[in-house]
A protein has these predicted regions:
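Terminal, low-structured helical/coil segments at or just beyond the last alpha-helical repeat
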Residues: 18-29, 118-151
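Structural signature of tandem alpha-helical TPR/SEL1-like repeats
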Residues: 41-49, 76-89, 112-123
């Protein structure tokens, strides 16, 4: 009798479980796409949420650390300490990460440390093999603008 009762309870719970809707958890790629869309719209809150979820799920994802740092730097009240933390993590995970070199260089300019930005510009020249890659060009322009504004 106990076996029959246990079987009926188990069967009932399986039927009940079948009625519960399945939640689709976004994949890392979906979260990164959502974060990039949010960044394009300057929706820093959503971008930070999505990239933080990716970092939590994949702590060794250099792209996620780079984008999370970017959101900390670009939000209304920049948090450069958090930005530097995640840029450095991205570069530790992937020392050749061109985007992280560009963005940490720009963060150093915000922090009034142009010599540090120049070091990352030099790193980009080596990584790119020339001065033509987009990341090098963007950081070079930011550095030139900084020097013009701060003679």
């Amino acid at each position: 009798m106990k076996k029959i009762l246990a079987t009926m309870m188990l069967a009932g719970s399986i039927v009940h479980a079948a009625d519960v809707p399945v939640m689709n958890v976004p994949t890392v790629n979906q979260r990164m796409k959502s974060a990039r869309t949010a960044i394009a719209q300057s929706d820093w809150r959503t971008a930070k949420f999505e990239t933080q979820k990716v970092v939590d799920e994949e702590p060794s994802n250099a792209d996620a650390h780079n984008l999370l740092a970017y959101t900390y730097r670009k939000q209304e009240k920049p948090d450069l300490a958090k930005a530097f933390e995640h840029y450095k993590t991205a570069l530790k995970l992937n020392p050749q990460h061109k985007g992280a070199h560009e963005y940490i260089g720009e963060a150093y300019l915000m922090d009034r440390k142009p010599a540090m930005a120049e070091q990352h510009l030099s790193d980009l020249e080596k990584i790119c093999g020339n001065r033509q890659c987009e990341e090098y060009q963007d950081l070079a322009k930011a550095l030139a603008a900084y020097r013009k504004a701060n003679p």
